[in-house]
Amino acid sequence: MRRELMKMKINVDKSLIKAVKTGKVIIGANRTVDAAENGSAKMVVLASNCPADIKKKVQETNVPVLEYEGTSVELGPVCGKPFTIAAMAILDAGESDILAATA
């Protein structure tokens, strides 16, 4: 079972990398909430340690939410960024299959 979880996490990580490189994403809690509220986000990715108020605001919208198992410290480098990412919105997945993660 643990191996299955590791494989799944690796696939999510690869999908996130591909979405960042080939699609259009918004990084940052406030901008992510705005994208979710105005309907431009196709999916929101929240780090496991994302602040509760941000989670609540996003979950009040109809946008699918992917709760990333890692922390914001881990999510940043996965996306190729040298900073933490607590929340990000996927506007266009590009060549990534990340949108299937919540299907």
Swiss-Prot record:
SUPFAM superfamilies per the UniProt record, alphabetical: L30e-like (SSF55315)
Family under the similarity heading: Belongs to the eukaryotic ribosomal protein eL30 family.
Thylakoid found in the keyword field: no
GO molecular function: RNA binding; structural constituent of ribosome
UniProt organism field: Methanosarcina mazei (strain ATCC BAA-159 / DSM 3647 / Goe1 / Go1 / JCM 11833 / OCM 88) (Methanosarcina frisia)
Gene: rpl30e
InterPro entries: Ribosomal_eL30, Ribosomal_eL30-like, Ribosomal_eL30-like_sf, Ribosomal_eL30_CS, Ribosomal_eL8/eL30/eS12/Gad45
Keyword Acetylation: no
Signal peptide: none
Gene3D superfamilies recorded: 3.30.1330.30
Keywords attached to this entry: Ribonucleoprotein, Ribosomal protein
One GO CC annotation: cytosolic large ribosomal subunit
Taxonomic superkingdom: Archaea
GO biological process, one term: translation
Name of protein: Large ribosomal subunit protein eL30
PROSITE patterns xrefs: RIBOSOMAL_L30E_2
